[in-house]
């Protein structure tokens, strides 16, 4: 049997049961009705319980805009601090560093950051962060924090259109998401490799089914019913291509054997919000290994794969319920990818790079 459309192989539950779950952030308020800060840590690759650890840190919180003073009031009002009010929610990824302190010290330092925010636009809408008041606990991340940081607005802000352009905006950190990295590294497949097309090859893609503790339908993420009748979401990631000698047929059984030999283990982390981590503990074919730059651990941040889904579920519980390998014929090389709506060289349309 040859593969002409798509074939599916379902991984055993044991491949994701150990670390395929993320606990939700507890959304609690104190007596002043202010959100209580909290730190959440996911562990990938058996990191050390004590001493120095490598932590990827992702800050979550609220955008707050400066209140406008009333035109009419007393003279004393001219010197009063108008304060800030919430105008949206978002995040600030500050990356990976070696950390020796404890979790609560890191949380306290993060909540004391003074972060100014500006909304702007280049090729895409961007959010600009400028950070002050960096405490010693955050010095491992200082090389990034001390410089201005820009991110795609649709990746770090739930509703960037709500951020005003004519007022001062601050980002107040409430939650800290950490991914503690052990023996596994944070490797992401290069875009050139992920976009690779080779003739007479089979593309191995992974479809990851998840359930989450938040209602997503009202936010534009429609859930579907799985085989058990339960609501679930799914997303896809690209693993790589496999190739046989010229003239040999690709069968479902052949592809299945290749996948089973890799002995893939799946975990969920908090890199960029929610992230999928794939660890190949078995043997990998030479063709596929070269595409992975001979790495065995791959990180897929949902922030890059599906930013809107990531924005909706990054504070909730997330659990892997099923993982499928999808075997599909590789796209022909003559197929072109059009990242822009306006295509070059079509009629009277011209585009200058």
UniProtKB/Swiss-Prot annotation:
One GO BP annotation of this record: virion assembly
Coiled-coil ranges (or none): none
Keyword NADP attached: no
Location, primary (coarse class): virion
One Pfam short name: Matrix_Paramyxo_N
InterPro entries (UniProt xref): Matrix_C, Matrix_N, Matrix_Paramyxo_C, Matrix_Paramyxo_N
Superkingdom as given in the UniProt entry: Viruses
Molecular functions (GO terms): structural constituent of virion
Subcellular localization(s) per the UniProt record: Virion
GO cellular component terms attached to this protein's record: viral envelope
Key words, A-Z: Viral envelope protein, Viral matrix protein, Virion
Keyword check for Chloroplast: no
Protein's job: The M protein has a crucial role in virus assembly and interacts with the RNP complex as well as with the viral membrane.
Family according to the record: Belongs to the morbillivirus/respirovirus/rubulavirus M protein family.
Protein name from the UniProt record: Matrix protein
UniProt source species: Human parainfluenza 3 virus (strain Wash/47885/57) (HPIV-3)
Lineage: Viruses, Riboviria, Orthornavirae, Negarnaviricota, Haploviricotina
Gene: M
């Amino acid at each position: 049997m040859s593969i002409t459309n798509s074939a599916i192989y379902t991984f055993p539950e044991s491949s994701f049961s150990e670390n395929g779950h993320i606990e939700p952030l507890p959304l609690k308020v104190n007596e002043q009705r202010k959100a209580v800060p909290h730190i959440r840590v996911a562990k990938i690759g058996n990191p050390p319980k004590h001493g120095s650890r490598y932590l990827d840190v992702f800050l979550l919180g609220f955008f707050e805009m400066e209140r406008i003073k009333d035109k009419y009031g007393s003279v004393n009002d001219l010197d009063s601090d108008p304060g800030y009010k919430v105008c949206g929610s978002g995040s600030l990824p500050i990356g990976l560093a070696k950390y020796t302190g404890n979790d609560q010290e890191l949380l306290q330092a993060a909540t004391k950051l003074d972060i100014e925010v500006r909304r702007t636009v280049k090729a895409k809408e961007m959010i600009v962060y400028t950070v002050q008041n960096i405490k010693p606990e955050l010095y491992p991340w200082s090389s990034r924090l001390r410089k201005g940081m820009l991110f795609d607005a649709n990746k770090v802000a739930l509703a960037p259109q709500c951020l005003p352009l004519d007022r001062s905006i601050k980002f107040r950190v409430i939650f800290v998401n950490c991914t503690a990295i052990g023996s596994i590294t944070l490797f992401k497949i290069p875009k050139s490799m992920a976009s690779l097309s080779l003739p007479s090859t089979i593309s191995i893609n992974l479809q990851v089914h998840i359930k989450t503790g938040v209602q997503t339908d009202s936010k534009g993420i429609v859930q579907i019913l799985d085989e058990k009748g339960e609501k679930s979401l799914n997303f896809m990631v690209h693993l790589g291509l496999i190739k046989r000698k010229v003239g040999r047929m690709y069968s479902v059984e052949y592809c299945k054997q290749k996948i089973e030999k890799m002995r893939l283990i799946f975990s969920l982390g908090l890199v960029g919000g929610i992230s999928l981590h794939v660890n190949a503990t078995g043997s990998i074919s030479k063709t596929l290994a070269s595409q992975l730059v001979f790495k065995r651990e791959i990180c897929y941040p949902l922030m890059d794969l599906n930013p809107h889904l990531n924005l909706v579920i990054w504070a909730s519980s997330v659990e892997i319920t099923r993982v499928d390998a999808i075997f599909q014929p590789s796209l022909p090389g003559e197929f072109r990818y059009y990242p822009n709506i306006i295509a070059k060289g079509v009629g009277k349309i011209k585009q200058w790079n």
